[in-house]
């Protein structure tokens, strides 16, 4: 992959756009821009404009930034639900191997929860589903949390979201693995009071 090859795959209105493209490809990386160009080409635009490519990049970046914030809120919420339930008495907490290992050092349930990776937290949540019976649909919780974990991983690695593949999740009894469904999955894993604001912020990403 060569710098010039990426530049030559886009069309420019003027020399200023070309210089801007050179600047941002150097800052953000050739691979990232190539992914976006490939995505534009896959939608029947064989020679996308730099304006279109850079617009997609900014849209994707805003989407990733907002998803990151709200997905962190989901993680905090799940930790809080378990911590609030078992902080004073963890005798009924079904503990995973990783939780047991880390609790030996941190003692407190809440402090131990903070040390768990997302994957480890999800394992603990699924072992203690009944804590969330008034919040989530327990029948779809495992598949939806798995999809959540995969999306979180894509975002953490700063991947171009529109070109990625995702896991299936279930929204209103419909199952799909599209980015749109995975974003909706984040919404329904949030506490109720965050959902309207989340939808507003996601819709604003297009602006």
Spans of model-derived segments:
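Acidic/aromatic/glycine-rich contiguous surface patches that form carbohydrate-binding/processing clefts
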Residues: 158
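Extended intrinsically disordered or low-complexity regions, especially N/C-terminal cytosolic tails and loops
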Residues: 1-151, 162-207
